[in-house]
């Protein structure tokens, strides 16, 4: 059981039992069992787990863990239609390895160990999402086992089809009927969600259930970021793309975040595949351990690296590289064509991984990864974080994607120390407050899980909170689907399960 008690978060929860199904029938059996005993007033919490890559404790639970590790088959590849059908436990690495034979790929830049079901359930925003779209834009259809064991396939219904679906005398029919009434009654709330600050807290994808033309209704979007609280994804039909061309890179350095922000704002208009910024203190720490950036190393004394990647056709790339160099005329800019090995650019991300696993640090836990911050807010935030650094007496270099506005900071805490665990929780609360004060969202980059669920409530209005609670009840009337995640997260629960030893080999 210990192998299923941790993920990449700061908590550790030992389950009562672990089930490892091989197919959808197995999951239906397990869900019927859990639902039957829940109706007899014995709730066995059910948590689905892919490869255990969650950073927020979403795949941990005290009840039954359903691991999809054996549901890892690629069922069908339609090269002509560019569609692929996979089981939810297929990893991104395996999928793209198979698709490469067809010169296709799923252009989502995430941890290769992530499962497709996990990517949908946690709904991360990757650095390429601005150009290609997040995982949401590549999912055509889902097969889901509901809380009572019923199996459904998501369908985009017309109004006539929706009326027929509502008449079904089973949980699926009650879901469509209840959700349609809920969406209609909360139209103004949903409109505010769609136009509000970018947040993954709750079930914000409810804003995509009823299309703007009011002619179609589809529950598929609700499972993005739901973290197994509404049902268990078993199969996915994905839309895939041709493998993109190898990118060309431009590196610029700046002494301040303000200067870097001015540059990135202009470069973003050229629609790069990726546009990332790194505090160079990250690379100075890596350099102490013999990890270097090759010919990029002399630039390390500047405050911030900005790395831009273009992967359009050759002529468009050449033009955009020239334009980017012109924008950065007052900065130090280097391209992969300028006697710099392409591997040196790839090494930037490798060195970030070295920083995250610094052997001289007790641990840099993923407490505040993937928060959302606008460009203008980023400058204000970089100033405010200096006071946090002073209070903690440690550096907090920022890194992330300007293109998607998703950033990460990794504090250094010794979770084996009681006082340090207390400081970590205080830091979590204060940091989330600073993010909101600067116009950002603490849960902008992925769903909140258990850990971020503690501090995501201020991002929701009372009506939004009530709406999300009602959605949960419609799908999970007996309340046993990952109940301590998202809206069910409590401070007492997280503190009780805080790890007392570090995670080895975790980024």
Predicted regions and their residues:
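C-terminal substrate-binding/cap subdomain adjacent to the FAD-binding core in PCMH-type
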Residues: 121, 129, 139-347, 458, ...
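Flexible helix-coil linker/hinge segments at domain or subdomain boundaries
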Residues: 325-337, 431-447, 477-480
């Amino acid at each position: 059981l210990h192998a299923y008690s941790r993920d990449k978060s700061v908590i550790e929860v030992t389950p009562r039992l672990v089930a490892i199904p091989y197919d959808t029938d197995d999951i239906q059996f397990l869900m019927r069992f859990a639902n039957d005993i829940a109706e007899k007033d014995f709730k066995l919490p059910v948590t689905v787990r892919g490869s255990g890559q969650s950073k927020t404790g979403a795949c941990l639970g005290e009840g039954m863990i359903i691991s999809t590790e054996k549901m890892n088959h690629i069922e069908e590849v339609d090269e002509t239609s560019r569609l692929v059908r996979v089981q939810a436990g297929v990893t991104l690495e395996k999928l793209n390895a198979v698709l490469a034979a067809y010169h296709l790929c799923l252009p989502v830049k995430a941890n290769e160990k992530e499962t497709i079901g996990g990517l949908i359930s946690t709904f991360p925003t990757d650095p390429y999402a601005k150009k290609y779209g997040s995982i949401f834009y590549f999912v055509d259809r889902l097969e889901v086992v509901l809380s009572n064991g019923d199996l459904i396939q998501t369908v985009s219904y017309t109004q006539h089809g929706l009326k027929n679906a509502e008449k079904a005398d089973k949980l699926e029919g009650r879901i469509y009927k209840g959700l349609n009434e809920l969406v209609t009654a909360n139209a103004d709330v949903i409109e505010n969600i769609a136009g509000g600050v970018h947040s993954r807290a709750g079930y914000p994808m409810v804003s995509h259930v009823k299309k703007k033309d009011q002619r179609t209704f589809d529950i598929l979007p609700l499972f993005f970021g739901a973290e197994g609280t509404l049902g268990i994804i078993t199969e996915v039909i994905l839309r895939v793309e041709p493998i993109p061309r190898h990118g060309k890179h431009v590196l610029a350095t700046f002494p301040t975040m303000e200067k870097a922000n001015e540059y990135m704002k202009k470069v973003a208009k050229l629609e790069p595949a990726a546009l990332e910024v790194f505090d160079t203190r990250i690379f100075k720490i890596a350099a102490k351990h013999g990890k270097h950036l090759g010919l990029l190393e002399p630039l390390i004394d500047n405050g911030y690296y900005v790395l831009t990647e273009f992967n359009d056709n050759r002529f468009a790339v050449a033009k955009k590289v020239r334009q980017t160099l012109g924008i950065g005329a007052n900065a130090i800019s280097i391209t992969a064509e300028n006697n710099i090995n392409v591997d040196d650019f790839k090494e930037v991300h490798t060195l970030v991984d070295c920083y995250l696993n610094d052997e001289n640090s007790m641990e840099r836990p993923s407490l505040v990864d993937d928060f959302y911050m606008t460009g203008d807010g980023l400058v204000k935030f970089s100033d405010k974080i200096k006071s946090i650094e002073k209070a903690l007496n440690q550096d907090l270099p920022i890194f992330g994607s300007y293109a998607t506005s998703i950033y990460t900071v990794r504090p250094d805490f010794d979770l084996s120390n009681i006082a340090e665990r207390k400081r970590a929780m205080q830091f979590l609360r204060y940091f989330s407050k600073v993010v909101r004060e600067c116009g950002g969202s603490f849960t902008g980059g992925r769903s909140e899980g258990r850990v971020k669920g503690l501090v995501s409530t201020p991002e929701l209005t009372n009506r939004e909170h009530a709406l999300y609670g009602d959605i949960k009840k419609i799908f999970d009337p007996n309340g046993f689907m990952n109940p301590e995640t998202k809206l069910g997260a409590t401070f007492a629960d997280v503190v009780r399960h805080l790890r007392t030893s570090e995670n080895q080999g975790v980024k």
